[in-house]
């Protein structure tokens, strides 16, 4: 990576992930934090609003932000619906989006891919920015070549709105790409309580836990006669996601297409 400065705007700077992203942008020598997008505090600085070490202005209008700050990259750490709008607006303005929200449908991704091709710029959407979680997904895909029986348990803080998590869904999709679809469990099993066996994707069972005290955790459990294999990743704080955010900001400057999943930009 060259030392050329990358101008960054952060959407959702006051959220827990957003606060970490602000710190990342401030402390990274070749990043320049030129603005932020929030639904309040228009034209106030990050220093005034959240005591950040930055005088970048907050904008409530994303288009005004792009026009005035001329960023290279948008880091979006908002919510699924807002993230979709921000991602499209960024591409329309020639800004490369790095998106940490989930909930994009196949139709959404196709539309965004067409926009990246039209504009000739890159975009990265990552269900999980923790490099360890991405490796867990890749290792799970490898293991699925040898273990056809698998279930996924994801555990998150109790303020998370979506279930199962984007990481769990992405893991199941990656496993499905190398595994012949198989109905998990006994063919005649019966749920005494509806939902007891979890959600299902391509025959893979997914289970979601929501509790205070958790951050982001996932275990992929494989079974075979006489043995089990467990692959687990734990994020103990949100700083764990910043290595992936940094990598994505750097890599999105080098690509001219939509990339979904951090596993597609690491060797």
From Swiss-Prot:
GO terms classed as biological process: diaminopimelate biosynthetic process; lysine biosynthetic process via diaminopimelate
Active-site residues from the entry: 156, 160
EC class: oxidoreductase
Protein name: 4-hydroxy-tetrahydrodipicolinate reductase
Gene field: dapB
UniProt lineage: Bacteria, Bacillati, Bacillota, Bacilli, Bacillales
Gene Ontology MF terms in the entry: 4-hydroxy-tetrahydrodipicolinate reductase; NAD binding; NADP binding; oxidoreductase activity, acting on CH or CH2 groups, NAD or NADP as acceptor
Ligand binding ((S)-2,3,4,5-tetrahydrodipicolinate): 157, 166-167
PANTHER family reported for this sequence: 4-HYDROXY-TETRAHYDRODIPICOLINATE REDUCTASE 1, CHLOROPLASTIC-RELATED (PTHR20836:SF0), DIHYDRODIPICOLINATE REDUCTASE (PTHR20836)
Chain positions recorded as NAD(+) binding sites: 12-17, 100-102, 126-129
Family to which this protein belongs: Belongs to the DapB family.
Annotated Gene3D superfamilies: Dihydrodipicolinate Reductase, domain 2 (3.30.360.10), NAD(P)-binding Rossmann-like Domain (3.40.50.720)
Alphabetic keyword roster: Amino-acid biosynthesis, Cytoplasm, Diaminopimelate biosynthesis, Lysine biosynthesis, NAD, NADP, Oxidoreductase
Organism this protein belongs to: Bacillus velezensis (strain DSM 23117 / BGSC 10A6 / LMG 26770 / FZB42)
Family annotation (InterPro entries): DapB_C, DapB_N, DapB_N_CS, DHDPR_bac, NAD(P)-bd_dom_sf
Family matches, as SUPFAM superfamilies: Glyceraldehyde-3-phosphate dehydrogenase-like, C-terminal domain, NAD(P)-binding Rossmann-fold domains
Record Pfam families: DapB_C, DapB_N
